[in-house]
Amino acid sequence: MKTFTYNNKDITIPKPFDSCFFGSNPLKEMTIHNRFNDEYYQQSATLPAFAVAIYDTIIGSEMSEDYDTMQKGLTWFQKYFTKQYFVLLD
């Protein structure tokens, strides 16, 4: 398992997400837009790159119908990035 310190919190990355590519700067903040935005309703959330990698894995798992991995990712997001979870994944 990998651990990152972000906003003075230690965040553990569980398997299988610990094998994600987190980029050269995993703590770099990125803005992700809700994938269901339209011209009347738009939401976005700021996340560190390591959380964006897990977000991408969740979306990919949903598309490939790997619901076990998807649920593990959703549970992780609910624990560590609750506000962003409700904006992006709920």
Provide a role label for each language-model segment.
Residues 81-89:
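Acidic, proline/glycine-rich low-complexity IDRs
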Residues 1-29:
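Short, charged/polar N-terminal "headpieces" of proteins
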Residues 25-79:
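Acidic, low-complexity, intrinsically disordered interaction modules
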Residues 3-8, 66, 72, 90:
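A broad, low-amplitude sensor of folded, mature protein cores
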Residues 11-13, 41, 84:
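Short, isolated positions in well-ordered beta-strands
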